[in-house]
């Protein structure tokens, strides 16, 4: 149990847990990751990990491959899909008697709390999490935030001359038939955005009226944020409601895309990393 726990904690560090820590920088993060990897190698960690995630396939695979290259006694299986699909798979397995998943990393904090209420989440707080703001730590070790991502407004810079400033700006004729959102049934980010937007007394609330305005303006729906990024960058859509790191990375790579954090408030998308309580 302790040996496998140390393996999982090292994986949590590799996946960037310390990246949310206040006052941390790239240099210190790299140092801490190196130290954790060295410890893992020195301890000759061995085991098989099963990870369920909604994070981008290439991102997670790169992290995992880096981890196992430093720990050759470790193997892994990765299931990656949209949050909705991941939850369906996990729930089906649990209903059938159990799951092999050890690590959960997807965008549905409420679902993680439900699992925790059933006694299915292993509570543990690694030393590296001590400097994390409380905002990024959940239920006394139930889970920790790996990174902070937000739902924002992205637009194609060759088609939009004046950047939107707030949510209502994309309900105008400029975006008629050319604004898209992700499917909340598939995308955890889209579901979180919808939930926050219609929650009473929330500072980021825009209400159902905003979604009705989108519908009246012939809003489009795609399955995932990744598809939104591709179609905004190509010019098929003028804009999209999307998670911020995708247009940021695309912009940095030279794509004709930019993004804004709405003035009335962007939506934080919790994507906690949790450990299933099935270690042996």
What are these model-derived regions, one by one?
Residues 89-96:
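Short, well-structured alpha-helical segments in soluble
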Residues 2-23:
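Sec-dependent N-terminal signal peptides of Gram-positive bacterial secreted proteins and lipoproteins
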Residues 110-114, 233, 238-256:
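A ligand-binding cleft/hinge motif common to bilobed small-molecule-binding domains
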Residues 18-35:
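Bacterial lipoprotein signal-peptidase II cleavage site
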Residues 41-46, 50-75, 85, 250-251:
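Short, polar/charged alpha-helical segment
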Residues 149, 211-214, 221, 253-277:
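Periplasmic-binding protein-like
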Residues 53-61, 83-84, 99-236:
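Extracytoplasmic ligand-binding site segments that recognize negatively charged/polar headgroups
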């Amino acid at each position: 149990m302790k040996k496998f726990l140390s393996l999982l904690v090292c994986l949590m560090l590799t996946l960037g847990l310390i990246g949310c820590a206040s006052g941390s920088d790239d240099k210190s993060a790299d140092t801490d990751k190196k130290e954790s990897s060295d410890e893992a190698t020195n301890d000759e960690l061995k085991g098989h990990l099963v990870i369920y995630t909604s994070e981008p396939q290439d991102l997670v695979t790169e992290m995992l491959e880096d981890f196992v290259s430093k720990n050759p006694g470790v193997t892994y299986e990765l299931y990656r899909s949209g949050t909705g699909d991941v939850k369906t798979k996990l729930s089906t397995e649990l209903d059938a008697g159990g799951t092999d998943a050890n690590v959960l990393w997807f965008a549905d904090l409420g679902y993680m709390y439900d699992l925790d209420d059933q006694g299915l989440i292993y509570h543990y707080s690694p030393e590296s999490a001590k400097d994390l703001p409380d905002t990024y730590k959940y239920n006394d070790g139930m889970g920790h935030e790996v990174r902070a991502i937000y739902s924002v407004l992205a637009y194609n810079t060759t088609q939009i001359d004046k950047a939107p400033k707030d949510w209502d700006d994309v309900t105008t004729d400029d975006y008629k038939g050319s604004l898209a959102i992700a499917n909340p049934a598939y995308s955890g980010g889209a579901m979180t955005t919808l939930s926050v937007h219609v929650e009473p007394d929330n500072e980021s609330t825009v209400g159902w009226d905003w979604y009705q305005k989108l519908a009246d303006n012939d809003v489009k729906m795609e399955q995932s944020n990744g598809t939104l990024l591709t179609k905004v960058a190509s010019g098929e859509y003028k804009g999209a409601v999307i998670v911020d790191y995708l247009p940021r990375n695309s912009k940095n790579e030279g794509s004709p895309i930019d993004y804004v954090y709405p003035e009335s408030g962007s939506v934080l998308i919790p994507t906690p990393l949790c450990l299933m309580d099935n270690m042996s």
